[in-house]
């Protein structure tokens, strides 16, 4: 009996996902043809999550079951499939996979529903749903997955120049200013404090969706100024101390600047630095 029930539930969930596949293929149109093979594969893998987040599943009515038997629904089955698929995706790719899920749902909504001012409410609702994936699946999902937009070489250079104060501060290439009037009971500002203020001010002027990339540029600038032998190979013995030093410096941004910075910035593949930066209260 239990085998029959589980088989029926699985069949229902499969039917729901099959219907979703038809909807997806109609909703994407030409944009789906432009997707890269990796994106199409991720979308196929994440279709249970799309179905669950859209609640395109309804409880199964089985009046023949006894009341003490758990009434599993097709949503529960799809939820399980969503978590199972998400767990199989590497952590570094989950943020991209979540964006694909959001994009799939947006594509299936009528364009009128995504116009201002309704757009902000829709995005807020979607963000809350995605944040629940972490608890629902009991796996790590980035709390805030910022849309990773491609920047041109000129924009990359501008970002790096804009955050030169941050590079200077994180490297502590500033020294206290000598004030010849120590008897004056006034806080003695240092050049480091001035650079810190400039860093926070520059970072606050960068749009949120580019701050993660900006932080990478800072780390890259610091890396390039280190002796090359310290950065050869991802697992060189002398490298962990350097990586930990930079990671701790980047974490200092959370208490240094009172602005939003992505909770976890995926590290570039060229140098696997676990960049982590959030914000807490406190002005520059």
Curated annotation (Swiss-Prot):
Keywords: Disulfide bond, Seed storage protein, Signal, Storage protein. GO terms for molecular function: nutrient reservoir activity. PANTHER family: AVENIN-LIKE B5 (PTHR33454:SF11), PROLAMIN PPROL 14P (PTHR33454). Belongs to the prolamin family. This is Avenin-like b3. Seed storage protein. Might be integrated via inter-chain disulfide bonds within the glutenin polymer. InterPro entries: Bifun_inhib/LTP/seed_sf, Bifunc_inhib/LTP/seed_store, Glia_glutenin. It comes from the Eukaryota. It comes from Triticum aestivum (Wheat). Residues 1-18 form the signal peptide. Contains disulfide bonds.
């Amino acid at each position: 009996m239990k085998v029959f029930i589980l088989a029926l539930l699985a069949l229902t969930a499969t039917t729901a996902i099959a219907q979703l596949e038809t909807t997806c293929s109609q909703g994407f149109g030409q944009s789906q043809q432009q997707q890269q093979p990796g994106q199409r594969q991720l979308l196929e893998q994440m279709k249970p999550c799309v179905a669950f987040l859209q609640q395109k599943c309804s409880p199964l009515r089985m009046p023949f079951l006894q009341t003490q038997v758990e009434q599993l629904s097709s949503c529960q089955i799809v939820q399980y499939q969503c978590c199972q698929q998400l767990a199989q995706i590497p952590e570094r790719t989950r943020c991209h996979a979540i964006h694909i899920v959001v994009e799939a749902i947006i594509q299936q909504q009528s364009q009128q529903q995504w116009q201002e001012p309704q757009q902000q409410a829709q995005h807020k609702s979607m963000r809350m749903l995605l944040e629940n994936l972490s608890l629902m699946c009991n796996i790590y999902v980035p709390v805030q997955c910022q849309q990773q937009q491609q920047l041109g070489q000129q924009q990359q250079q501008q970002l790096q120049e804009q955050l030169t104060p941050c590079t200077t501060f994180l490297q502590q290439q500033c020294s206290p200013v000598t004030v010849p009037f120590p008897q004056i009971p006034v806080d003695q500002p240092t050049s480091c404090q001035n650079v810190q203020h400039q860093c926070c001010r520059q970072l606050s002027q960068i749009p949120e969706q580019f701050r993660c990339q900006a932080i990478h540029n800072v780390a890259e600038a610091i890396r390039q100024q280190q002796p090359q032998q310290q950065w050869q190979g991802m697992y060189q013995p002398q490298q962990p101390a350097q990586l930990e030093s930079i990671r701790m410096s980047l974490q200092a941004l959370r208490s240094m600047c009172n602005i939003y910075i992505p909770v976890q910035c995926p590290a570039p593949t060229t140098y696997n630095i676990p960049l982590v930066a959030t914000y807490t209260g406190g002005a520059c």
